[in-house]
Structures are given as C-alpha cells and as structure tokens.
Amino acid sequence: MRNQDIINVAVIAHVDAGKSTLVDALLTQSGVFKENEVIVEQVMDNNDLERERGITIYSKNCAIEHNGTKINIVDTPGHADFSSEVERIMKTVDTVILLVDSSEGPMPQTRVVLQKSLEKGLRPILFINKIDKKDERAEEVVDLCFDLFADLGATDEQLDFPIVYGIAKEGIATLDMEDERKDLTPLFDLLLDHVQPYPDYSTNPLQLQISTLGYDDYLGRLGTGRITNGTLKVGSTVKVSKRDGSVVDAKIAKLFVNEGLIKVEKEEAYAGDIVTFSGVPHISIGETVCDINNVMPMEMIDIEKPTLSMNFLVNDSPFVGRSGKLVTTRQIRARLHKEMETNVGLEVNELDGIEGYKVSGRGELHLSILLEKMRREGYELSVSKPEVLMTDIDEVKHEPFESVIVNAPDMYAGSVISQLNVRKGIMHSMNSENGYTRLEYLVPTRGLIGYRSEFINTTHGEGTLEKSFDSYQPYSGVIDDRRNGVFIAKEKGKTMAYSLFNLSERGRMIVEPATDVYPGMIVGLNSRSNDLTVNPCKNKHLTNTRSSGSDDAVKLLDPIKFTLEEALEFIANDELVEITPDAIRLRKKVLDEKDRKRYNKEMLFV
C-alpha cells in the first residue's frame, strides 16, 4: 500500500514560454536544493545541446513534496519537432500547467499541446507568465486562451480552468493581478485543491504503459511510465504486451523513482508513481507491462509519422578523416540504430546504389539535433537537402502543411505577405497593433525550408516566425526556388585575402582567408542566379615596381557563418553539407567541374 498521495503534473507551452524556468522555481521553493548549493538555470535541461540552444529537447521528470503529497513534475519540449514527446506524456499525468506569455498570447504550439491534453480529458491550469513585461496584456490573453479552449472542443468542466498570474524567473505566482506577489505558494496550493491524487490501485493486477525510453551502457534499455494499476517489484516476472500483439516474459532488474532531481533505486513502487526500470531488453513506446497472471494491455500509443527526410551519406570529400575518426558506413549505421533505441520518431532506411541512409524525422530541428550530437561524438558525414515526405490519401497526393504565426514591424509586413504567398501560403488572419502586424498562415512545409534566413533579412531581425505541423493537405504545386548561385572552388589550397577581396565585388564570402578548400567546395554566394567556378587561392603576383604604400592590407567584409540548420536550409538539390567535428562545409555533390556539368545536363531530363 502507498504511504502518501501522488499527483503527476506536466508543464506544457510553446517554446520559450518559460517552462523550464518555472520548474526551476518549483524545485527551489520546495526545498530540493541545499542552502549552500549552486543552482544553474534550466536545471532539468542537462543535455549540452539543450543548454546551448535554451530549449528542452527531451521530456524529463523530477519530484517535489508539498504538504505531504508527492508531486511528480514532467518538463516537456516546446518545439513542434518534439510534439510526439508531449503527446505520450499526457497519458502519465493528472493535470497540466499551460504556460502562456502575457504579451505574445497563444502561439501555434500552444494550440497543439493544449489539444492533446484536452483530448486526454485533463483539466489544465492556465499560468499567465511574464506579467512584468511592459507590453503585458494578461486579461486579453486570458480571453484568447478561453477562445482557444472553446475552439478545441473543451468540455464545460475544462472551460472552468483556474488562472494563475506569475513571473517564473522570479518564482512568483498570484491568483489575482492585484494581490501581493511573494512566492509560488498559490500555485502549490492550487495544485492540491484542483487535482485529485491518483487513486491507490496498488492491490490491483499490474499495468504500466511505457511513455519514454532511455539507455544506459550498464543497464541497457530503460523504460519509463506511470504505474496505472498494481505494484512493481524488483526481481518480479512480468508479461509485456508488445506492439505487434505478442506477449513475452521479462524480469525487472532495477527500479528507480524520482526524488527531487535524482532517480533513487527502490525495491518496489506503487500505483500512481512514475518509475524507470531495466530488464526488458526490447521494450518500446506504448507497450504495456502486465501482471504475470493477468495480461491487460492498454490502448497503444500512436507514434507520429515523420514529415521530413535527409540522406546521411559517407563523407567522400578530399578532407575526409582530418578531424573525425568515425567515418565508415558501418560506424554510421551502428550510431543510427543506437539512436533508434530511444528516438522513436526516427526512421532509418538504407539507400539503393550508394553508401548512406535515408533518415526521416519530425522536422529540421529533430534531424539537426541528431547531426549535431554525432558531430560532437567524432562522426564525419555528408547530408543532402531536407526533403518533405508526401503521402497518398484516397489516391490523391498530399503534403504536410504548417501553422505559421508571424509578428513583424508594419513596414515589412507587405514583403512577408508577398514571400509567403509565393510559397503557396494561405492567410487566415491579419491584424496590426503597436506598430507590429500579426499574420496567421497555413503554409506547405516545402515552402518553409530555407525561408527563415530570408525572413530575418526581410524584417532586419525585428520579426518573429513560429510554426508547427498542422495537417496533410492536397499537393499545392511547384514552388519557385529563387536562390542565387554560389562560388565554387576550382582547386585545392588555402584561400588568399587578395582573391576573396576581388570576389567580394560579385557576392558574399562564406570562408575566411587561410581556409583550406578543395575543388567543388562552396566558398561564397553569387549576387547573380548562376553558379560560378572561381579560384579563391590565387595570390597577387609580385613585381619590382611596387610603391611602398601599394600593399596595404585589403579590407574584407566578415564572411557569412552558417549554423548547421542554416546550412541545411540553404543548400540546393545538387549540393551537400559536409559535417565534421571541427567544421561545417558546403559542397557540390559532384566535385569535378566537368563531371558536374555532365551531371547537371542529365538532371534536366530526369
């Protein structure tokens, strides 16, 4: 039997709304940290990439206590590419805290995560965050949230949601904007008042559905989920109901529950608690761990299908192996299959005729995070332009569309509208306030690949663009790609400032002086539409007639530095991104100039 009440809570929101910051404050004020302990921001985001990017990529659990009740808190990703993580978490919690920015209001991903929680019958708590902003409009945002609840078909009970106003960064919450603001006690108390503790079903036959996976080099594959019924014990034999309908025996080797930020090993755990265990080698998302004498599988969790794919190819550039030690097909295959152990939104298929793999995922960020991890682990590979995955519905070709919300200064709104229209976007609404125009669009995913950098340039960095997967719609036709051409290196060597300076009159460079280049490598962006083969390694000829002041150092503009995502968005169909531990290079698929011309002619007739 359980010795305390248990409540499971997920914190959900759009990216950058303050989820991880709120979890930090809840942990701090619940006494998880010692008085002299140094506390880092976004303490749950313990992955290097999460800290660098300031986003949550993997959902994670922690536990706090308030007035004798154990509260398991799940911090979820806010980015649309990881929405399948959020959906699975909904089956393990009793309520959700929905964070909404007091000035931005509901965003595309707010709608997605809220819809998933309402469909599971949960009654959310609305937390209006960042009420200290100068442009806060908390009451108006509450009305917008109510409209969103209604649009998503919320029941009368769900529409009667409690509202908390607060500043997550300062650890403040209040039930009324006029009340004194001290700490998060109003939120803690509201959780206990609003949510019924999970019933003590510890004496029922065991039922536990897997919501997330992990991997430990010593323990092997780890399964995490809430014990819906029964008691889970170390050493006990259980039945596992698999996705294909089969049932297999397994033995629980290790069992962990959350206490604060750490996982504590236990001999047994009870209904309502979120646990992590080892001993089931091939367990997967949605499968049910059942009592040995009473197999009652729970409804299978659907795993969202990928919408985007890239080809991961063996690096065949002249610089292969310079900085990475993991370069072979076998090594890349092993790494991708290891990733599939825990990254269930990923699909990997071998390519025909060439050494490489077609890797499909939920979006550019989903796949670029994997590439960045591999790069840091010492892998080298080349990657093709992202390609949208089409599907046939009733024998009609369909493609993924995304919900897009743009906020841009009024003076740039016309240009943004024109650009989105060219990309087959469909405008749903437009309104202007305080010098900014808010646009809501439905745009094919194809049309958004490579658009973010153009949007930033158009709005001079003053606009924001948020997107999330919406639905599959009938194919919208050819989208005109108006990207300018590129400068392609002619020979192997080091770039010279003299050559780069002369080339800069025709476009922008993406390499610095003294950069190693090879034939077929992209070194700059042409101001015209055609590609141009150039020699960036050419130096100024020496003469004996030079005056003393004629060799002043040339002044070069800073080169354009592509991040991994920007490089993937930028490349054309006949180009690749070469990814190594110490460099990201752009190159043509066919490096030799004569072979490349022949290849391009052949592609015209394909």
Predicted regions and their residues:
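Structural and coupling elements of P-loop NTPases
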Residues: 1-606
